[in-house]
Amino acid sequence: MRCTRAIRQTARTGWLTWLAILAVTAPMTSPAWADDPPATVYRYDSRPPEDVFQNGFTAWGNNDNVLEHLTGRSCQVGSSNSAFVSTSSSRRYTEVYLEHRMQEAVEAERAGRGTGHFIGYIYEIRADNNFYGAASSYFEYVDTYGDNAGRILAGALATYQSEYLAHRRIPPENIRTVTRVYHNGITGETTTTEYPNLRYVSQQTRANTNPYTSRRSTASIVGTLVRMAPVTGACMARQAESPEAMAAWSERTGEAMVLVYYESIAYSF
């Protein structure tokens, strides 16, 4: 797989050096996804528990290509046919994304485009055998269809990746609690409230230890924007932001962000 301008821009220069070290050492180290699969995962969503506790989460479609999901191609700004529901094993990553959306509401109000009010939800979910590690599934895809050149950046991605893919659906019985975050645009006060899901079924389960075995993508050219930090994946977070907006988000959250572009990919996935 040949990529031109593989690393286009970094939000902070220090992360580029760290990424280069990581890319060299990744094949020799044990990445995060090699740990025990999580028993609990998290998802940010704008839908209230009145809906989610009743219906759970359902994927957009039946496209189970892992690469197209991780690059956002099958997500909302793409074809909207992904067969996966994105979750994260890191609550903090999910909180950072919620904070970003809340900050957007505040800035819109300052610009005269809204009230500044914001309501967002973080759902705590019991993972089971239907949840697959995004990074390990990506490695499986590279091993099956790609070549060794793709493993270097995949190793760097795996170190940051905290996304777990639920295939097709997350039933209400897997959703343990929801944390409601409300920001009052008038007073500036933010309140957080947790609610249990009365339909939740308590079991001792974990995410699948195996990667998801994906079909091969038919796309001949894939333009990929991978956010290395602090977000979890293209379908988990927003895909259409400019590098400037993403760098500004990085400054607000106190996190460094590395933007990696895979462009002009000659290899047909």
Swiss-Prot record:
Keywords, alphabetical: Signal
SUPFAM superfamilies found in the cross-reference section: ADP-ribosylation
Signal peptide: 1-34
Disulphide linkage map: none
InterPro entries linked: Borpert_toxA
Gene Ontology CC terms, in alphabetical order: extracellular region
GO molecular function, one term: NAD+ poly-ADP-ribosyltransferase activity
Family label: Belongs to the bacterial exotoxin subunit A family.
Protein name (database record): Pertussis toxin subunit 1 homolog
Species of the source: Bordetella parapertussis (strain 12822 / ATCC BAA-587 / NCTC 13253)
